[in-house]
From Swiss-Prot:
Protein name: Proline--tRNA ligase
A single GO molecular function term of this UniProt record: proline-tRNA ligase activity
Keyword presence, Protein biosynthesis: yes
Broad class of the protein's primary localization: cytoplasm
Alphabetic keyword roster: Aminoacyl-tRNA synthetase, ATP-binding, Cytoplasm, Ligase, Nucleotide-binding, Protein biosynthesis
The enzyme's E.C. designation: 6.1.1.15
Organism this protein belongs to: Trichodesmium erythraeum (strain IMS101)
Catalytic activity: tRNA(Pro) + L-proline + ATP = L-prolyl-tRNA(Pro) + AMP + diphosphate
Notes concerning its domains: Consists of three domains: the N-terminal catalytic domain, the editing domain and the C-terminal anticodon-binding domain.
């Protein structure tokens, strides 16, 4: 391709709407254009990157025996209602674009395809002899993001590889899961990215085992906790750890003390001369289920710890059946306005005790009449602790479970792990933190969808049983931008060789110099014929403009047919290091072959 023929416009200034470096650079370098909020066009350079990432993904998937297919983007609402996810995706998370056709039928634009693939399996798979089977697709997906941002990182449409496997037993499912773990690691290594595989929450997808693949980058939306020994890594939503040890309690006897102006843990510790580890704090949440019922949740947790909202949401989702519901639509700490709708009297905020009376809740069909009380494991074994008294300006000290307060029946792990905590696998190790961009996620779904949708097969014993499932996703367009977020400098993008739109750019400093044009043209032909993706900058522009654009666009290697031609040489500049060397024209092909082969190892 000749740049003089390509649709390419580069910008010198950062676009106003872009927040992170990769977003700014992809727009400035002419890779993408914003069409609407969270909607982008992939211009020729970007599509080449997408295609190269897709090729790597396909090769690794095919190597595992997975088969490529293409599933419909429009999905009937009935399928999602069967699985029980329609309300979750159109109301709770609200990320599915839904529409009504001219026959008054509800449809959704697919953010994911578990329901569709399960329906296909239900219709086609009859016997254990057909198992295991693994299908995947590369396709545009849609999400009605509340706040689209960061370009391709969080758009309303995106390109994704999603795969789904079906199995007769757990052993087979685990083998495919392990195969996908290996395949995903290979995809990211081959793409030239630094990454971590981390334990993750299954979220609305569901299932048991779940792992995310994070590209490490300072602008990553996700926080990762890991140990230096490489034996543990998890995202913040899923991470577990051992908190610091409890300090000896300074409270010998039970008492109620006046503690004015101590609504926070910090002020309480200062007033009572105690450690936050000696306190049981009680955090009030309001959960709204999909049947409209609100449940007031009181979480008792050690004073130096925070509640992990995702872990709490998972606990409440598991309890949905107790309230004749299927899922949680919303979870929040109720503000003053929310409290007015259900509070029978003013709450003693900042001084709430574990036994806050149920008579604080107004009688209503839409509100559960009793607090749902749960205690985090960090608070269970505290003795002689301090806590609220349910009276403003007063706290209880020297309290114990089973004496002054009944221990809640629901003992849970809802604490948020944090940097500096001790590792569970080795308490001598502490958790470190890093930022990451999620580009892949694999799940062991089990029978969640097959049971809900009646997808069964006949096993070796002649019994009809639900199919076991796994699902595996890679954000192709997100991975491409994540590569930029991980590798750039003040001059522009530094593409990994494997996914760069072109390996080489040949710059002609003076298009009026016939020797420069001739040598550049011959090299352009020779390199492309040898399988080296090469683009020729033959534009009628100043040399400085061409060099700046080459750095901005991020092509790994630049050949300049400049003054050194007088001695039969050209300049070779490596984008990642800016190192420049002069090589004779006859050695350009062999030199570049060696450099590219080395980079791809």
């Amino acid at each position: 391709m000749r740049l003089s023929q390509m649709l390419l416009v580069t910008l010198r200034d950062d676009p106003a709407e872009a927040e992170i470096p990769s977003h700014k650079l992809l727009i400035r370098a002419g890779y993408i254009r914003r069409i609407g909020n969270g909607i982008y066009a992939y211009l020729p350079l970007m599509l080449r990157v997408i295609n190269k990432v897709s090729t790597i993904v396909r090769e690794e998937m095919n190597a595992t025996g997975a088969q490529e297919c293409l599933l419909p983007q429009l999905q009937p609402a009935e399928l999602w209602q069967e699985s029980g996810r329609w309300d979750t995706y159109t109301q709770a998370e609200g990320i599915m674009f839904s529409l009504i056709d001219r026959q008054n039928r509800e449809l959704g634009l697919g953010p994911t395809h578990e329901e569709v693939i399960t329906t296909i399996a239900k219709d086609i798979i009859r016997s254990y002899r057909q198992l295991p089977i693994h299908l995947y697709q590369l396709q545009t997906k849609f999400r009605d993001e509340i706040r689209p941002r960061f370009g391709l990182m969080r758009g309303r449409e995106f390109i994704m590889k999603d795969g789904y496997s079906f199995h007769a037993d757990e052993e087979s499912l685990k083998k495919t899961y392990q195969d996908m773990d290996k395949a995903y690691r290979n995809m990211l290594r081959r793409s030239g990215l630094q990454f971590r595989a981390v334990d993750a929450d299954s979220g609305a997808i569901g299932g048991s085992a779940s792992q995310e693949f994070m590209v490490l980058a300072d602008a990553g939306e996700d926080e990762i906790l890991y140990t230096q020994d490489g034996k543990y890594a998890a995202n913040m939503e899923k991470a577990i750890s051992l908190p610091v040890d409890v300090e000896a309690s300074p409270f010998d006897t039970y008492d109620k003390l006046e503690t004015p102006g101590t609504e926070t843990i910090e002020k309480m510790c200062e007033f009572l001369h105690c450690s936050a580890t000696n306190i049981v704090k009680n955090v009030l949440y309001q959960a709204v289920y999909d049947n409209g019922i609100s449940v007031l949740v009181l979480v008792s947790i050690r004073g130096d710890q925070d509640v992990n909202d995702v872990k709490l949401l998972n606990e409440l989702t598991r309890l949905a059946g107790n309230y004749e519901a299927k899922t949680v639509l919303a979870l929040s700490v109720p503000d003053v306005e929310a409290q007015k709708k259900w509070a029978a009297k003013s709450l003693p905020l900042g001084y709430i005790a574990p036994d806050l009376s149920d008579d604080y809740i107004t009688s209503s069909k839409q509100v559960s009449p009793k607090f749902l009380r749960m205690v985090d494991k960090t608070a269970v074994y505290l003795t002689n602790f301090a806590t609220g008294s349910n009276e403003l300006g007063n706290h209880i000290v020297g309290a114990n479970w089973g004496q002054e307060f009944a221990l809640p029946k629901l003992v849970v792990d809802v604490r948020k792990a944090k940097k500096g905590d001790r590792a569970v696998h080795d308490p001598s190790k502490t958790l470190e933190t890093a930022r990451g961009i999620e580009v892949g996620h694999i799940f062991q779904l089990g029978t969640k969808y097959s049971e809900a949708m009646g997808a069964t097969y006949t096993n070796e014993q002649g019994q009809e049983v639900p199919l076991l499932m796994g699902c595996y996703g890679v954000g192709v367009s997100r991975l491409a931008q994540a590569a930029v977020e991980q590798s750039y400098d003040k001059d522009g993008i530094i593409w990994p060789v494997a996914i760069a739109p072109y390996h080489v750019v040949i710059c002609i400093p003076n298009i009026k110099d016939t020797q420069q044009i001739e040598v550049a043209g011959n090299l352009y032909k020779e390199l492309n014929e040898a399988g080296i993706d090469t683009i020729l900058d033959d534009r009628d522009e100043r040399a400085g403009v061409k060099f700046k654009d080459a750095d901005l666009i991020g092509i790994p290697y630049r050949i300049v047919t400049g003054r050194s031609l007088k001695s039969g040489k050209v300049e070779l500049i490596e984008r990642s290091t800016h190192q420049c060397q002069e090589i004779v024209v006859a050695q350009v092909l062999s030199t570049l072959k060696d450099l590219i082969e080395k980079a791809l190892k």
